Amino acid sequence: MSKKSNKNLAFSLLGLMMSMVLLSFASVPIYNLFCKVTGYGGTTIKETVSVYSKVKGTKAIIIEFDANVDPNLPWHFIPRQKRVQIVPGQNTLVFYEAENLSNKDIIGTSIYNVTPNKAGKYFVKIHCFCFEEQLLKAREKVLMPVTFYIDNDFERDPEMENIKVITLSYSFFKIREL
């Protein structure tokens, strides 16, 4: 091989490596955008104007809460409640707890989904920590609120007839240390 072809190969490999690093940092925001646009993976609806339903449903639904943390993020993250029982149209406030176990300030972001996936279109979030990146100072512990309701149309959808339990799951990922 000539020096010119070795140089071209080196630049090509360097460019490929840089592209992979950039893509790894952009993957969570790109995934969130993809899910919001397509409704993929049980993505919920974000209420842009807080319209609180005055009409409440009659079918009791259990909402279970799940929390996961990427191994690269030294946080402890748990739901404060394991489950709640609600009816469609009932506004509900729950909390997750996050603690930064490191000696550094860290910014994290979360992705979420609802299972079963087909119930995601009826899960409406009014307020959620997942709408923004979260900064936790070194050794800081915080409560993170989520306010939501299940849309009343849930009861009228024949596909939801056998749904008794819905799981809201969050996964936190590290953005950067400060």
Swiss-Prot record:
List the Cytoplasmic topological domains.
Answer: 1-10
**What GO terms in the biological process aspect are recorded for it?**
respiratory chain complex IV assembly
Q: What is the protein's membrane topology class?
A: Single-pass type II membrane protein
Chief location bin: membrane
All ranges on the Periplasmic side of the membrane: 36-178
Q: Which parts pass through the membrane?
A: 11-35
Q: Where in the cell is it found?
A: Cell inner membrane
Name any one GO molecular function. copper ion binding
The GO cellular component terms are: plasma membrane
The superkingdom listed in its UniProt entry is: Bacteria
Q: Pfam families given for it?
A: CtaG_Cox11 (PF04442)
Q: Which UniProt keywords apply?
A: Cell inner membrane, Cell membrane, Copper, Membrane, Signal-anchor, Transmembrane, Transmembrane helix
| SUPFAM superfamilies (UniProt xref) | Ctag/Cox11
The UniProt entry's sequence similarity note says: Belongs to the COX11/CtaG family.
Q: What does this protein do?
A: Exerts its effect at some terminal stage of cytochrome c oxidase synthesis, probably by being involved in the insertion of the copper B into subunit I.
- NCBIfam families per record: PRK05089.1
Name of this protein: Cytochrome c oxidase assembly protein CtaG
Organismal lineage: Bacteria, Pseudomonadati, Pseudomonadota, Alphaproteobacteria, Rickettsiales
- Encoded by which gene? ctaG
